[in-house]
């Protein structure tokens, strides 16, 4: 074995059953496991063994040994005896091989050798100093006397007691806590004897060569395996000599024989526990004498046999990739009493042969599907007479699977014969699917029970395995088992291990992608309270004390629905087992004082949610997927003494076992009437068992003790009844996607309010409120998302490649939300593209989600936010004053930030106190600035939601980073630059950020710079460092001078800004920022650069505060420009800015990453009020806000200088005062120097612009604004609007009274940028902040607030489920405060929504953007909309920050959305920007008109998309970063960033700013540019999700990668949807939770799905929502459910959805709504706003559906192709000149044909629209080719063809939906809901 052994070992590890070898290194892995052999060496691990003996360790403590031996010694003795005993043929016989036995006893280390036992001390017990020799002799002595049984039994008791032991290291500890051992611990009570023992006998042979220093090799042979000729070698020491192996083999054989012959004996906890429960556990330690080792030169026959057997075994197990066993230490370090995770890692249970058998067997005959498998396990009675008595009345025939029961009364229990004779009663015979006799091993039970169920689950059906029986019959042991050895593992750990093996095998065989999530819930106590056992380990868990936690809701359609439970992603079996350990530890029965009653009434439901995505080979390529669940239920015995009496009355008391049996029978039978239907346990069982397609297995436990005959009979009878009946299809049964539940079915059945997707959103969803069941908002039973399939269609219907869809199964190391960021990571290279590249929506969502920190990679779901938030919150709260005066805060925020940072002094200038509040580390912007805005958010962020555990740590870092930057200025940031939580773009950003640190400050300074500058809003959605939450979704608002942008469409200005910012680098790397960045592609490019600097700065900021970091980052970028010019390195206003931002939007920042931007805007906002600042109403003020914290520090001079610099470098048409106002407001006014200079700072300006800035500062400003939330919302809206109109109208829309006088859109290149002056003023700024911040983190607050609100409101049942804590969803977290929702409703939010919706329309109601005239743009005044939005926003905030408008109204809530809004401004450069605009337009209008949150982005279900969904058409991804979530951000970011060629697109852009149209166009061109230039940056589609599950989890992510062609620009529809945060409730689809980059999806898909719920691509929810939306405009919220029905965006979506619904496109929902062909449209399409934009005022429902229809699914690749990176495009053109010439003629001809067709289609569309009662020409602009394109160019032709194709599709859709839409149109009155005039911008 030595030589061969090595190979065997290698192979074996997979099998490694026992890793008893305590061999230090080699066997370490195993050693911990194998406590049996654990020798002194093992001791370290030995502790493990102790736990095994669960009692063993503890026993040490008690000196219960014979003659004063401690318990531990007793255990050792028992083990020694057992080992010896097993080697003897019979009780009285002597050891078969005396030499061997002697050797064994001689060398055998004490079974439970204490860790303390070291080689020397090994022999002596530390506790009682008993020498091992004594024990050995005693064992030998006992061996001679066949009393071993009693001895063995006796130890049982001891071991049971042992659990308390703490002596053994982790092992023991686990034992005591022993969830596993303990659970089975019940087993302890159930049966002391074999708690740890495997039911079946197994032999463990430890071979320790004398010369090897005690290294042991343990071979574990299970009896069953022995019989089958299979040997499982847990670990073979490669050094063992063949002789040893031979001896071991001999011993093993002997033992095997014995084992088979002997009845299982409860072994001492020590070693035997690992083995069969009652089964014989043989542990032989074979230690050849020193001489023998050398002496045996050749392997003996036995050795040869053994080796051969091992080799065969190894071959058999080759399939399984062994996990390299971690050092034993790993095992020993379990945090919980049990360590199943360690066991599965080191010694995964060997998979039963039937598990991986032919797939054909996977699908059982239809006949057996409805049947419930019932298995009977007979638990041996304790005592020597057990077998005899058992035989007397119980006969088992395992082969026939029958059990015969005799009446014990008939005869003496001892004599079966006499009894039989005397028995008058006929014996009762019962048949089952399997019968496990007393000596059955645990492994037998597991393999016989789990295999078929697992296959069903992997095949897409639900599965359920539960134990049933009276007390102390081993139910828990069967289900949980013990972690002592692989043989003692129960069904749950085995199921976990095998499920992953099966998934792995299935993945390899079919390419299916899997994602597994785990949830664990317990029903316990007399009150039947429901507990989420994983709440404590849930990354963003808010449940703790403040959250209502998990609850059950009765759904008339879907039955019981479990809501709000934590559903944690488990990429590996070890992780899932870790959650099992955590659940067991959290279970009430594991508590010290747990009494028998508690145990009886404790029922644990452990669920594995399996999401899978398959490539569909048929027809159009696509992916289909579904979710299936495996419920593993450990039912208590329910026999509470009081329970029986109360149970009859149906009281809350525990059900009796018989009552429970009746319930199970009824559920399994599908009976209409279920007894005790209101009992929580019944509801829980219904949720898991009642699914018609659920493969259920029941394991009934009975005792073979005659004394329990009555109980046994009743249990057997019930089990037999269940076995006989066939499951009827219950109408409520299909709660899960399980076999029958299909998307349509589940969705149709499940009321919209039940839509899982939005658990939180739902809570926010106003529509849902009435219908919502108690848990509605959070409702997301695992079954809720049970739609089975999600289909992803490639561009043009082409199949997506597996890689594209699955991302090669491997989660990207880094998922930059913004591709540009990804680019930043040069080292990554092409990989960057992969990072973001998520093959599927689900994957992307997952990743984004992760990034969000929701799940964890990012530092904690919502973790970043949470983490930061928590510190910030703490800090934030301190500055209530700031909070108190939001507006004041606006000005103050900057000051506030100062305190935060070293630059505080400067910052203080504005409002020192707020600054203080802003200090990230101490007080997140919690303080005053955000009180209003933040209050909700704050509540959510700081107080409302508890800091997420994971995120919390990062925030400090962030803070540190922020601070560092503050102090050192740029440098600090560098060092501190946050690293993205998981491989988020943050990393990239980190570097770039560094350089930009100074610049960003500068940028911030210039934030309010000139209106002339274009405002580039860069929303970096990268989890800035730790801020997973922040994800950096920094909305960088940069105002670039047009000139600067113009050059090459690249951020030439940026370059001019300053190398200091490394803007160039940023430009390339930060492109993502660009995405959000500007209306102009140039801006985009510019932004890219700036963002880099910004990001660095931002990173620093991020360090300081998530939101702030974004904001600061933006500001920094802005400042960057200014800063670079102005060497003065303010401590980087990062900190200050942050502070400033924070003050303005610190709460947002704190609460959410987005907040950072918000914070930034906050200053802007303050700036907006900035006029408040005074220096320059717009410019200086803007500047100040831009760098609220830092800049102010810099002081006017710095600002002035920066502003000037920026100005000069970014000469731009100065925006009118409007911009100035807004910017000024934004700027603390700290830089009194002319607003002209710094204000023009692109970032600042942007903020001022209201879009981006508003987004970034919106939050901060919000507080500043009269209504904290409103300003933010407004900002968001403004952003969106801006995007829409391409003007700053959004700013106007922002509540700011001073409407932002929008400067006519600047042209980016040929395109007119819809840049408005920062007129938005502070109102706008806040809005922008909202958008930006909202994107990041603000949203969480809102969301949270919303969610809770929704939770309360939505649940119509009145049985208000406990207010569901907002799930971890980043968004939600970001919007954490429950209060946020109300705030969200704040005008700011509403305003923002309105702005988005109103598209540039100054919403009088909001801030009366009196200042903004929409003059320059064609923005329609959407004042009324603002109001509506406002109103809507309130609701919307409840939603998912669905629309930008929504988000703005939500303020923080709009984190995702806000970014969208942010992009709005930078739409041209970044689709997202446009997206927000269109969304704004349509969404805003809707939002305003109707409370729906239709605002663009409203649909974006994911925050990431922020407005992405609403932005749908406008490449959400453009700023995915806009997406409030960094997760989404990265996606969008990449897409937007890639648009390096904005200039190209811009060129084509129309000179005229049609307002929304232009924005759309810009977005479109932006998309093209992205494809052209952005793609490269992206590295193709570098959308890896940083935190994809394992490969499985990554799930399908329609990859941006799919269009890796060229630049892999994000599809025009690309929008990054913020990952939905199912938050604590299972989302039906993994994708549901993941963020989606709509662009990633095929055009059609992307557009449709994205539009519908651009970020929500859970196929299910979104579908469902869509259908609901279809129902009516008012139903929009429902349809928005997914994203947050309440949000305007949602509304918008719902409007769209009507069409979908009519179409029956429920499924489509998964897919991003197809956006109008961005390519075809040129830029316009890219803007989600495009479609939303076009018909903003339109009745939400009508236009939205249309838009959906309109969306043509552009071929992403095509888009990419026609839109090479701007830089690329020119080159391409040059290179292809000759080709073009050659093709010119042909092209011209084709062009004429296409134009003719296009014209014809336009006419048809107009006619159809008339029938649909839509405004004629409503979407036409979507189908127009970007004017920037050369009509002669192939690109133009391609774009035209795409546009035509999209138009054709739109026409067809419209025609197909004429009737349906017409119906909805009739109720379009929804628009009436929008107060104020509704205008359609097209």
From Swiss-Prot:
Biased composition (Gly residues): 54-66, 856-865, 1495-1505
List of residues that carry Phosphoserine: 31, 885, 1262, 1662
Biased composition regions of type Basic and acidic residues, renumbered to the chain: 1397-1412
Any coiled-coil regions, as ranges: 1784-1812
Sequence segments annotated as region (Disordered): 1-66, 149-201, 316-337, 729-785, 851-915, 940-993, 1121-1237, 1335-1728
Tissue: In the developing cerebral cortex, preferentially expressed by migrating excitatory neurons.
SUPFAM superfamilies: P-loop containing nucleoside triphosphate hydrolases
Record's compositionally biased regions (Low complexity): 165-187, 732-741, 1135-1152, 1532-1546, 1672-1685
GO cellular component: a single term: microtubule
Gene Ontology MF terms in the entry: ATP binding; microtubule binding
Effect in UniProt of substituting residue 1602 to W: In CDCBM11; uncertain significance
Cellular localization per UniProt: Cytoplasm, Cytoskeleton
One GO process term, biological-process aspect: regulation of neuron projection development
Listed PROSITE patterns: KINESIN_MOTOR_2 (PS50067)
Binding residue positions for ATP: 469-476
Pathological condition linked to this protein in its record: Cortical dysplasia, complex, with other brain malformations 11: An autosomal recessive disorder of aberrant neuronal migration during brain development. CDCBM11 is characterized by dilated ventricles and reduced white matter, and is associated with axonal developmental defects.
Role summary: Atypical kinesin that plays a key role in enteric neuron development. Acts by repressing a cell growth signaling pathway in the enteric nervous system development, possibly via its interaction with GRB2 that prevents GRB2-binding to SHC, thereby attenating the GDNF-Ret signaling. Binds to microtubules but lacks microtubule-based motility due to the absence of ATPase activity. Plays a critical role in cerebral cortical development. It probably acts as a microtubule stabilizer that regulates neurite growth and radial migration of cortical excitatory neurons.
Entry similarity comment: Belongs to the TRAFAC class myosin-kinesin ATPase superfamily. Kinesin family. KIF26 subfamily.
Assembly and interaction partners: Interacts with GRB2 (via SH2 domain).
Name listed for the protein in its UniProt record: Kinesin-like protein KIF26A
